[in-house]
């Protein structure tokens, strides 16, 4: 069984990592590389979502979409955006 994360709970987890900077955190390492690096990760994952949608299983597609959401939220944390900032534009 896995623990279900929501958009909000993932954001809170990433924000906490950014604030507490646990040693060995991949999220912290990515944040330290800056927006350019994070933007490249979003582009990479968006391409993988497209490829998965064309050629892979639903399970693989779901995994790629989750990675795109993760990297998008890391950018949100880096820029100081909150989920509410996104929700008002949906």
Curated annotation (Swiss-Prot):
InterPro entries: HisE, PRib-ATP_PPHydrolase-like
CC per GO annotation: cytoplasm
Subcellular location as annotated: Cytoplasm
Entry GO MF terms: ATP binding; phosphoribosyl-ATP diphosphatase activity
Key words, A-Z: Amino-acid biosynthesis, ATP-binding, Cytoplasm, Histidine biosynthesis, Hydrolase, Nucleotide-binding
Source species, domain of life: Bacteria
Record-linked CDD domains: NTP-PPase_HisE
Catalytic activity entry: 1-(5-phospho-beta-D-ribosyl)-ATP + H2O = 1-(5-phospho-beta-D-ribosyl)-5'-AMP + diphosphate + H(+)
Entry's Gene Ontology BP terms: L-histidine biosynthetic process
E.C. numbers: 3.6.1.31
Entry keyword annotation includes Nucleotide-binding: yes
Enzyme class, broadest EC rank: hydrolase
Coiled coil: none
Disulfide bonds: none
Main location: cytoplasm
Pathway: Amino-acid biosynthesis; L-histidine biosynthesis; L-histidine from 5-phospho-alpha-D-ribose 1-diphosphate: step 2/9
Matching Pfam families: PRA-PH
Protein family: Belongs to the PRA-PH family.
HAMAP family xref list: HisE
Name of the protein in its database record: Phosphoribosyl-ATP pyrophosphatase
Organism: Corynebacterium glutamicum (strain R)
